[in-house]
Amino acid sequence: MAEFVRAQIFGTTFEITSRYSDLQPVGMGAFGLVCSAKDNLTGQNVAVKKIMKPFSTPVLSKRTYRELKLLKHLRHENVISLSDIFISPLEDIYFVTELLGTDLHRLLTSRPLEKQFIQYFLYQILRGLKYVHSAGVVHRDLKPSNILVNENCDLKICDFGLARIQDPQMTGYVSTRYYRAPEIMLTWQKYDVEVDIWSAGCIFAEMLEGKPLFPGKDHVNQFSIITELLGTPPDDVIHTIASENTLRFVQSLPKRVRQPLKDKFTNADPLAIGLLEEMLVFDPRRRIKATDALAHEYLAPYHDPTDEPIALEKFDWSFNDADLPVDTWKIMMYSEILDYHNVDSENQAMEDPLECP
């Protein structure tokens, strides 16, 4: 039986195994508190995320189960990886992952990024998305604070708590507004991997410009700002709008013509503008795919088709439509945790990190 020790962080009790020490708070999310810690077994610094009351409701239990399944399944250099998981005596769940020193949001607010770093960061984001999308997963909440970076410029996408299967009726407001694809605002229904490409395009533009591209005050203002730059959506996109109220709103907007991005990003590499033009397209069916974006001339210094892997198998979403009681989710969670700890250590080894430009 593992020995547990307690620590108070921001008034929250962390009840962790004695394998970890020197807890320091690094972030607070909607569903949990994250601390850095020393892994006394490996000597490495790690991130420990406490999921608050994971078994308090069926919805939260399912969300936690989904995040656990995704963290177990997704194994790629540009996606955050799970190094340990445990349930405390108080029945809180703790995810332990690798610790990276900062995130893209902090980098962008501290100083302008040089061209080679913008290229390298975008390359790694798209490399990670190619893998995630090949697994049948849409991140749905890609934003600078969900993109972690270490001192070697290695980049990893994190926070898959909102991630969903690629196809069914996806509903609601999921991503931070600035990075939200127009089809999420317009249809609230079907959307696919293209929403992540839009978000990556917004992040790319922010790296080029040093500030958010579409800083909407609310979703109406957000959509209006997008049309000021990209013009009025094509009719075939407008016809996909399911809500009559939304349709009336879009049709009430003044007709606008798409502005050349080169006029907005006057100092940017023309190749960067060319790729951005293909990422920020209203019609998701015409938006560039991660695989094609990686092959774009702008990313030629880093592109290597032999080292941009896809998932070995699709993620199993069969649980996702289940409406189960908390006790059933708890049993399933315990089973996943036991399975994780029985996996061969060789399956948990990650490849060598990429080199910094």
Curated annotation (Swiss-Prot):
<keyword id="KW-0723">Serine/threonine-protein kinase</keyword>
<dbReference type="InterPro" id="IPR017441">
    <property type="entry name" value="Protein_kinase_ATP_BS"/>
</dbReference>
<keyword id="KW-0539">Nucleus</keyword>
<protein>
    <recommendedName>
        <fullName>Mitogen-activated protein kinase HOG1</fullName>
        <ecNumber>2.7.11.24</ecNumber>
    </recommendedName>
</protein>
<feature type="domain" description="Protein kinase">
    <location>
        <begin position="20"/>
        <end position="299"/>
    </location>
</feature>
<keyword id="KW-0963">Cytoplasm</keyword>
<feature type="binding site">
    <location>
        <position position="49"/>
    </location>
    <ligand>
        <name>ATP</name>
    </ligand>
</feature>
<dbReference type="Pfam" id="PF00069">
    <property type="entry name" value="Pkinase"/>
</dbReference>
<feature type="binding site">
    <location>
        <begin position="26"/>
        <end position="34"/>
    </location>
    <ligand>
        <name>ATP</name>
    </ligand>
</feature>
<keyword id="KW-0418">Kinase</keyword>
<keyword id="KW-0805">Transcription regulation</keyword>
<comment type="function">
    <text>Proline-directed serine/threonine-protein kinase involved in a signal transduction pathway that is activated by changes in the osmolarity of the extracellular environment. Controls osmotic regulation of transcription of target genes.</text>
</comment>
<dbReference type="GO" id="GO:0106310">
    <property type="term" value="F:protein serine kinase activity"/>
</dbReference>
<dbReference type="InterPro" id="IPR008271">
    <property type="entry name" value="Ser/Thr_kinase_AS"/>
</dbReference>
<feature type="modified residue" description="Phosphothreonine">
    <location>
        <position position="171"/>
    </location>
</feature>
<feature type="active site" description="Proton acceptor">
    <location>
        <position position="141"/>
    </location>
</feature>
<dbReference type="InterPro" id="IPR003527">
    <property type="entry name" value="MAP_kinase_CS"/>
</dbReference>
<dbReference type="GO" id="GO:0051403">
    <property type="term" value="P:stress-activated MAPK cascade"/>
</dbReference>
<keyword id="KW-0067">ATP-binding</keyword>
<keyword id="KW-0010">Activator</keyword>
<dbReference type="GO" id="GO:0005524">
    <property type="term" value="F:ATP binding"/>
</dbReference>
<feature type="short sequence motif" description="TXY">
    <location>
        <begin position="171"/>
        <end position="173"/>
    </location>
</feature>
<dbReference type="GO" id="GO:0005737">
    <property type="term" value="C:cytoplasm"/>
</dbReference>
<keyword id="KW-0547">Nucleotide-binding</keyword>
<keyword id="KW-0808">Transferase</keyword>
<comment type="similarity">
    <text>Belongs to the protein kinase superfamily. Ser/Thr protein kinase family. MAP kinase subfamily. HOG1 sub-subfamily.</text>
</comment>
<dbReference type="InterPro" id="IPR038783">
    <property type="entry name" value="MAPK_Sty1/Hog1"/>
</dbReference>
<dbReference type="InterPro" id="IPR000719">
    <property type="entry name" value="Prot_kinase_dom"/>
</dbReference>
<dbReference type="GO" id="GO:0004707">
    <property type="term" value="F:MAP kinase activity"/>
</dbReference>
<dbReference type="InterPro" id="IPR008352">
    <property type="entry name" value="MAPK_p38-like"/>
</dbReference>
<keyword id="KW-0804">Transcription</keyword>
<feature type="modified residue" description="Phosphotyrosine">
    <location>
        <position position="173"/>
    </location>
</feature>
<dbReference type="InterPro" id="IPR050117">
    <property type="entry name" value="MAP_kinase"/>
</dbReference>
<dbReference type="InterPro" id="IPR011009">
    <property type="entry name" value="Kinase-like_dom_sf"/>
</dbReference>
<keyword id="KW-0597">Phosphoprotein</keyword>
<dbReference type="GO" id="GO:0005634">
    <property type="term" value="C:nucleus"/>
</dbReference>
